Amino acid sequence: MALHQSLLDLSELAPHCQSRATARGLLAEAQDILRNAVAHQDNEIELAHWYSRLITDIVRSPGVNSPVHLTGAAARGDQLPSIPVVWMGDDADLQEVFADVGLQAHAATDSIAARVDAGLPLGNGGEQALLEEALGQRPPALKMVDGLPDRDAAVDIKATLLSPIAAIARWAAPGPRPTVDRLAIGVERDLLTTADAESLDLAWRTGYALELRRWYEGVSDRPATLRDLPPLDRTAYGSACRIVSAAFESISRRAEEYK
């Protein structure tokens, strides 16, 4: 699905931003346009790619000219407004540019994941370290009551879906590229089975749709339980959690076999 012209028009302005005040205006307008795109049910992954590129172009533009290296979701092409923008390096004023329009942003904690997402060299033993870090993020199983997911169980889309899947994808294909692309490359590298990659891709897209919808509704930063989700979202979230749990079990088992 092609992006709406309003998105394309704004993305053309970003690299030519001439001041940090203009940057704030572009970031604010981007959120308005993104809300319209969500309302029209545009593709969530394409919207994340667009938003990531916009953030990157603004940070590198003449008016901002920040010396930092973006990492995390923005560097991968996975950025959403509800996910903090993170970077490596120092720029005391950059956080304020984002905060002024209601966006979270800060310097990243130095880690192998941050370095990989920023496009820095992995180093010896790096892939094993990424695998161990990813498997350490395996989400807990959904609590069940009478054979059904406990409706009082906490919902944390980032912690139970997005972060674990991004971590596995980072191990499968280190380098600053979108998570869905990393998963596909992981199959080519024979680190992921086709079934595991497809399952994680589905869970990732589900998580992105849910996260973007909660941002659109203005509740993405509020604590929530399964009971708070609409029935279809509740079912989708539960299914995605089970998919991720099964995929992590499969990947962990394969990793043990290759030791």
Indicate residue ranges for each PLM-predicted region.
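N-terminal regions immediately upstream of nucleotidyltransferase
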Residues: 1-66
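Generic structural signal of hydrophobic/aromatic residues within well-ordered alpha-helices
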Residues: 6-17, 23, 27-30, 34, ...
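Conserved nucleotidyltransferase catalytic core and NTase-mimicking acidic/glycine-rich helix/loop elements
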Residues: 34, 126-259
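Glycine- and acidic
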Residues: 36-45, 83-88, 149-153
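Active-site nucleotide-donor binding segment shared across nucleotidyl transfer reactions
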Residues: 42, 52-91
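Conserved catalytic core of two-metal-ion nucleotidyltransferases
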Residues: 59, 63, 69, 76, ...
